[in-house]
Amino acid sequence: MGSSSSTALARLGLPGQPRSTWLGVAALGLAAVALGTVAWRRARPRRRRQLQQVGTVSKVWIYPIKSCKGVSVCETECTDMGLRCGKVRDRFWMVVKEDGHMITARQEPRLVLVTITLENNYLMLEAPGMEPIVLPIKLPSSNKIHDCRLFGLDIKGRDCGDEVARWFTSYLKTQAYRLVQFDTKMKGRTTKKLYPSESYLQNYEVAYPDCSPIHLISEASLVDLNTRLQKKVKMEYFRPNIVVSGCEAFEEDTWDELLIGDVEMKRVLSCPRCVLTTVDPDTGIIDRKEPLETLKSYRLCDPSVKSLYQSSPLFGMYFSVEKIGSLRVGDPVYRMVD
């Protein structure tokens, strides 16, 4: 290498050494710069999203047994599979026929009269004309695992024993029933199976809820519905997990992502309503008409999504849990926007 080359190298701050040596040094330097840039980019805080308060949590319900009466709670954990209060999770128990097919208040309306009390390691069940029964939350691992069927999809459930099976059978008086419990080690029902044609939906799993981990309705939406009904209905007809006050009627239809407490939620879809909404939660009598017929008169979906909702009216919203945490009654509800 000539003197002119050595001078040029000196200007660049590279020693006059063999070409292979300084090229290696240069490469290492460039690599260090690149890694530093990547590290800086990763270390930069993400652009903070704006929070717009849209309401306040006025009520929280957990429904331990599918279709049975909900338990009102002041505070709850929010897991990726739904609400949890202590050791009790939302819709982790389900009544089934002996062949494993689910039974809900659609088939047995009097299920809505089964009251559940949370008692440390037990659930206490009460129903009209029945002696209370205590159900342990933790079941023996030796209990039989049933292959169950829920809205056409397979899911497992651990048998809760003969005593509670006889209790439900005696109460409903139509056929033999079993009670099963979901275990987090079991495989839940996934988005891909719940909505095989809706590939855009985020991925999540549920145990025995109909569609999603969280069901939310605003108080104002119920008020709006009741202005159209001869016989007023209460929120328990619709079995939400979270009720929101302080917003306009059906404003929840527009909420894509929410922050409540330290829980982040993402909209899945609107809640299509069925005949279950016509079961009176105080009497266990099914009407099969109202409030469903009135909802159909003004809450049908846009024609562009008719393949998803068919002729079901929409009332309430389903959400998935994007960040687990806890929430409580009185928490502000924030809409997260970019």
From Swiss-Prot:
EC number: 1.7.-.-
One Gene Ontology cellular component: peroxisome
GO molecular function: molybdenum ion binding; molybdopterin cofactor binding; nitrate reductase activity; nitrite reductase activity; oxidoreductase activity, acting on other nitrogenous compounds as donors; pyridoxal phosphate binding
PTM comment text: Ubiquitinated by PRKN during mitophagy, leading to its degradation and enhancement of mitophagy. Deubiquitinated by USP30.
Main location class: mitochondrion
Cross-link Glycyl lysine isopeptide (Lys-Gly) (interchain with G-Cter in ubiquitin) placement: 59, 138, 144, 156, 173, 187, 289, 296
Cofactor note: Binds 1 Mo-molybdopterin (Mo-MPT) cofactor per subunit.
Membrane topology: Peripheral membrane protein
Subcellular location: Mitochondrion outer membrane; Peroxisome
Keyword terms, alphabetized: Acetylation, Isopeptide bond, Membrane, Mitochondrion, Mitochondrion outer membrane, Molybdenum, Oxidoreductase, Peroxisome, Transit peptide, Ubl conjugation
One of the GO BP terms on file: cellular detoxification of nitrogen compound
SUPFAM superfamilies per record: MOSC N-terminal domain-like, PK beta-barrel domain-like
Domain MOSC, residue spans: 188-336
Catalyzed reaction equations: N(omega)-hydroxy-L-arginine + 2 Fe(II)-[cytochrome b5] + 2 H(+) = L-arginine + 2 Fe(III)-[cytochrome b5] + H2O
Subunit structure: Component of a complex composed of cytochrome b5, NADH-cytochrome b5 reductase (CYB5R3) and MTARC2.
Function: Catalyzes the reduction of N-oxygenated molecules, acting as a counterpart of cytochrome P450 and flavin-containing monooxygenases in metabolic cycles. As a component of prodrug-converting system, reduces a multitude of N-hydroxylated prodrugs particularly amidoximes, leading to increased drug bioavailability. May be involved in mitochondrial N(omega)-hydroxy-L-arginine (NOHA) reduction, regulating endogenous nitric oxide levels and biosynthesis.
Annotated protein name in UniProt: Mitochondrial amidoxime reducing component 2
